[in-house]
Each structure stands twice: as C-alpha cells, then as structure tokens.
Amino acid sequence: MYPAHLLVLVAVCVSLLGAANIPPQPLNLIQFKNMIQCAGTRPWTAYVNYGCYCGKGGSGTPVDELDRCCYTHDNCYNEAEKIPGCNPNIKTYSYTCTEPNLTCTDTADTCARFLCDCDRTAAICFASAPYNSNNVMISSSTNCQ
C-alpha cells in the first residue's frame, strides 16, 4: 500500500471515530422544533434558554407566560413517562401542519398521541405568548427560586 493511501485511510478512520461520539438529536425533538416553526413566527432557537423552564431541566417559578408554556410542556412530558413504554425523547408521532394549524393524527389514547398533544399545545402556547428578550439566558440561581 502506498504511504498516501495509508494516510487517507487513517484520516477516514479518525473522522469516523470522532463522528461516532456525536450523539444524534432525538427524533421527537426534531418534530417539536418543526411544530414550533409551523405554529409561530419566532425561530425555535428563541426558546432554547428562555426563562427558568425553556431548555433542559427547570426549577423555581416560571418568570412569565412563555416560561409557563415550557413549564407546562415539561409537566406534560413527565406525565407521558408514566405511560408504560412511553419515552418522550425518542417516541415519534404523526401530525400535519398547515401553517399555523397543527393536527395530531395518531390514534387517541396512545403514547404517540399524548406526546403530539404535549408538543402541539406548547407550540401554540409559544406562538401566542409575549416574548421578553430580558428573560433569555437568565441566571437560574438568581431568577428561578
């Protein structure tokens, strides 16, 4: 084998090893992102670190109406986890989007439908709630008591 071929082979292997350490984004999160974009005018990234509950985790009292949307969504996912075999992070669902209308199409009383309803309700709530840029990236230790 030529030295140049060996270098290319090593480079490809190293690249693949690096890519293997990047976790895939949960499919449900992608669906939720698409619902947010369907229902509203703000990009989904506007909600990533908003208030005390928009984003990963949450604590304290929601700072405003929009943060309450995230609080309610978190609680909805907590309820979904009580359904046997229902994992909000990986379970996908079916819905239609005719901007700004969202319709969940899975059979009622299933995990998929429950999760879709959680995401649909949150996306509609986000679209109607006022957005206060002062509540982005707030200190949870100071503002989320």
From Swiss-Prot:
Catalytic residues identified in the record: 73, 119
Major subcellular site: secreted
EC number(s) stated in the UniProt entry for this protein: 3.1.1.4
Lineage: superkingdom: Eukaryota
Tissue-level expression: Expressed by the venom gland.
Subcellular location: Secreted
Leader sequence segment: 1-19
Co-factor binding comment: Binds 1 Ca(2+) ion.
GO BP of this protein: arachidonate secretion; lipid catabolic process; phospholipid metabolic process
Keywords in alphabetical order: Blood coagulation cascade inhibiting toxin, Calcium, Disulfide bond, Hemostasis impairing toxin, Hydrolase, Lipid degradation, Lipid metabolism, Metal-binding, Neurotoxin, Presynaptic neurotoxin, Secreted, Signal, Toxin
Reaction equation(s) it catalyzes: a 1,2-diacyl-sn-glycero-3-phosphocholine + H2O = a 1-acyl-sn-glycero-3-phosphocholine + a fatty acid + H(+)
Protein name in UniProt: Basic phospholipase A2 KPA2
